[in-house]
Amino acid sequence: MKKYYDAVIVGCGVAGCFAALHLPQEADILMITKADTEDSDSFLAQGGICVLKNESDYDAFYEDTMHAGHYENTPESVDIMIRSSRNVINQLIAWGVDFRRDENGELCYTKEGAHSTNRILFHDDVTGKEITSKLLAQVKKLPNVTLLAHTEMCDILSGKNGCEGVLIRDEEGKLVPVYARDVIWACGGIGGIYDNSTNFPHIAGDGLGIAMKHQVVLEHLDYIQIHPTTLYSSKPGRRFLISESVRGEGAVLLNEKGERFTDELQPRDVVAAAIFNEMEKENSNHVWLSLAPIDEAVIQNHFPNIYEHCLEEGYDVTKEPIPVVPAQHYFMGG
């Protein structure tokens, strides 16, 4: 490892990899990650990625996004996200990402909460793993990128020009200052500070702590997304996500009486609040998710990861409902 790079990227999930792949190939880049390269939140994402299918869907897509964000979204950012989505998908496909296609080779679209139509591309129920692994493979081909696992950012190096690099702890535990013209943080998760989260435990908001120390302006630190459906367990550790696309394909939420109590495809904060309310009314530590409306072949074909994990936990989702509970999922401030 050298003492100076053109750019240091902290994190190697989708954001970090995408940054590395778009920087000039003559730039000397160091990427670091706190654990294994595959242990990013991006790797854990299940459901899929939304895309503008055609121009006629723009207005609905825009309104769905603004509504889900309680109209606090920056309109220009929403427009950029939607307008650029097809180009991003095309880039991902060019890098080898394999989205589900039908028998005619056309891309398949599923539905998730807060979307008024099917506009979600997916790879079974391990879309994050598919995207991140393919991006990582592309990054590892770049001769100008040095990727170091088990290497932790402990602080930034500040000087007269602002941020001038990072102080890292290497795999041997040594503190090493590394200087760079540009420092890119792609390490936004905070789930490790929660008892119940879908995130890896080591993802604990390190960047936020360092930002606060150096009086970096932060905003919306209370914008913490609670995912409505994780598999209930009394065991400690990371919570297993039950993808929203399961509800998009027809699964329903039930209370202890076997009654539906909410519209399952509302925005996540609304559905999570409805579940918490039902749990409080029934003095229960979970509600139930029934996949009975979904054909068994669809479950095993579209959701093989969820199907197998639930079997390991003693639940056959093709024959019985499963206990689910909300847990921390995304962090949208910073």
Q: Predicted segment positions?
A:
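N-terminal Rossmann-like FAD-binding beta1-loop-alpha1 element of flavoenzymes
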Residues: 7-31
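Residue-level detector of alpha-helix initiation sites
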Residues: 9, 13-14, 36, 126, ...
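Conserved redox-cofactor binding core of oxidoreductases
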Residues: 93-174, 179, 186-187, 230-233
